[in-house]
Amino acid sequence: MKKLLKSALLFAATGSALSLQALPVGNPAEPSLLIDGTMWEGASGDPCDPCATWCDAISIRAGYYGDYVFDRVLKVDVNKTFSGMAATPTQATGNASNTNQPEANGRPNIAYGRHMQDAEWFSNAAFLALNIWDRFDIFCTLGASNGYFKASSAAFNLVGLIGFSAASSISTDLPMQLPNVGITQGVVEFYTDTSFSWSVGARGALWECGCATLGAEFQYAQSNPKIEMLNVTSSPAQFVIHKPRGYKGASSNFPLPITAGTTEATDTKSATIKYHEWQVGLALSYRLNMLVPYIGVNWSRATFDADTIRIAQPKLKSEILNITTWNPSLIGSTTALPNNSGKDVLSDVLQIASIQINKMKSRKACGVAVGATLIDADKWSITGEARLINERAAHMNAQFRF
């Protein structure tokens, strides 16, 4: 039985690490692996020892913590209906009508049920653990994190106004108009800046038998990075914004101010992503001399919330050649449209385009982790871990005991 357990753990730790897939599970035996210190000699870890004192019971470890999520499985968290837009134009010819009146009961939300195509999250931090009786760890990390996210434009409610009869991009009645189409055939991606992040957690050995250890852990992590670069690519509208700002709360309701997207826009907020994640895990390890492979399962929930900030397409504050954006003419020429006394110059161009950064959350909660810890002189250790199913991630931890 011992040989079978050794083989299974060693195969999982080495074989799965070749296909690296939020928070690491960690080695369940980690609290009891480093029993000697680089500065102070280790003491008995037995609470039943009559000679033991509280000074013997407590030790401190420090080191490096690196966690790299290459593909987190996320979905957008939105309502089934989307309100504030005008009716979708359906007529074959002419112009859109009633674009200043919202649909009575809203419309089906094109973002509902959408999945993220790619979600990456990288963290580098300092690690500090308080150990009790060589059985339990209370630890924290302090460092920096940054991310990258990509999805269909439908997942972020890219909308605009098409078919509106106007000769000027800053027509006096344009500020009262509402977007009437949602753009689904496009891609939205954004990068966050590198921002301060932290986490806290606890890990303990629940059961030990010979060289085998069964342990559990709990962690919570948080960070608030800002969007550094937003890139929107679609046929009707394409734009890139460095350090985007937008509208939150009541100010994000349609219609947006006519100055939205210009340098004169007011009441805008930074696009900050509020990242929160918690996790519980259970893992089994088996010590093979200096190598301690392990396998575990975790249950985690992560959210990335930007307060549904709405960001307008950048545009000029005054017209140049009757336009304020570089959006293309969708039919290539306005000569095929009714002239309407020259008011249909812009009716085939997407106007007042904007995008909403919707809340994202975990689509799969359960995951599997495999890894191994290499120990040197019971004072130093290096741990490598790979995670699968709910994310593809790799983790590295190097630490020493004082």
Curated annotation (Swiss-Prot):
GO molecular function: porin activity; structural molecule activity
Domain of life: Bacteria
Segments crossing the lipid bilayer: none
Annotated GO biological process: monoatomic ion transport; regulation of cell shape
InterPro entries, per database record: Major_OMP_Chlamydia
Membrane association type: Multi-pass membrane protein
Cell location: Cell outer membrane
Pfam families in UniProt: Chlam_OMP (PF01308)
Keyword set, alphabetical order: Cell outer membrane, Cell shape, Disulfide bond, Ion transport, Membrane, Porin, Signal, Transmembrane, Transmembrane beta strand, Transport
Signal peptide bounds: 1-22
SS bond partners: none
One Gene Ontology term, aspect cellular component: cell outer membrane
The family this protein is said to belong to: Belongs to the chlamydial porin (CP) (TC 1.B.2) family.
Primary role: In elementary bodies (EBs, the infectious stage, which is able to survive outside the host cell) provides the structural integrity of the outer envelope through disulfide cross-links with the small cysteine-rich protein and the large cysteine-rich periplasmic protein. It has been described in publications as the Sarkosyl-insoluble COMC (Chlamydia outer membrane complex), and serves as the functional equivalent of peptidoglycan. It is present but some of the disulfide bonds are reduced in reticulate bodies (RBs). Permits diffusion of specific solutes through the outer membrane.
Summary of subunit composition and partner proteins: Part of a disulfide cross-linked outer membrane complex (COMC) composed of the major outer membrane porin (MOMP), the small cysteine-rich protein (OmcA) and the large cysteine-rich periplasmic protein (OmcB).
Name under which the protein is recorded: Major outer membrane porin
